[in-house]
Amino acid sequence: MTAWRNLASWLRQQELEAVLVTGRTNVRYFSGFAGSAGVLAVSGDVRKIFVDFRYVEQAEQTAPEFEVVRCQGNPLDAAADFLQQQAWRSIGFEEEILTVAEFSRLQAKVTADRWRPVRLEPLRTVKTAAEIENIVAAAVIADTALTNLLPMIRPGATEIELAAALEYEMRKLGSEKPAFETILASGPRSALPHGSASGKKLDAGDFVVIDFGATFSGYRSDMTRTVCVGTASAR
């Protein structure tokens, strides 16, 4: 795991002594932990992940380079308690992730003059070879799943049945979950932007728009295809 090392180097460049990582995507990226409740505190020589009792084992397994701190309550509050005890004068926080209420709770324990708003997404922009492999794997899963779905696209099938079948095919091929809500709309509904699958049955000659993606090791694919039910009319 080199991501946290890049983060520690970035802290020095930004003249920050530490950073509080709260966004789920960033928590996973920098630590490997993919649970729904976890917060990181990182400095040059500190790497802590705060989780509640449900996620201790998962954090120990997936974030081995972080010290796992079991919290009795909210991980954010536990992290704030820890930061309150440190002498750090400049601490980064994800201003686009935290709510006003959450930041108010942080300021109640760590004075406002010690906080610095940051965005961590630029650190993820340039992908490593391993990340690219994961993205390719997600795309291959989605492409193969669509190939498996094509024989099912016929008159009488409903949009929602086909969307479910496509997601099932992706799961069988190793997708963690859909990359986003699967869009599958046919006939006149295919003109809808981001049209959710409905109970509409496909008719012969319908065009079917499918916008979907797979997730592999946290990395997602996104592809859109249009197919015709049977033979398209001259129009």
Where are these regions (language model features)?
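Active-site neighborhoods and metal-handling regions in enzymes and metal-associated proteins
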Residues: 1-235
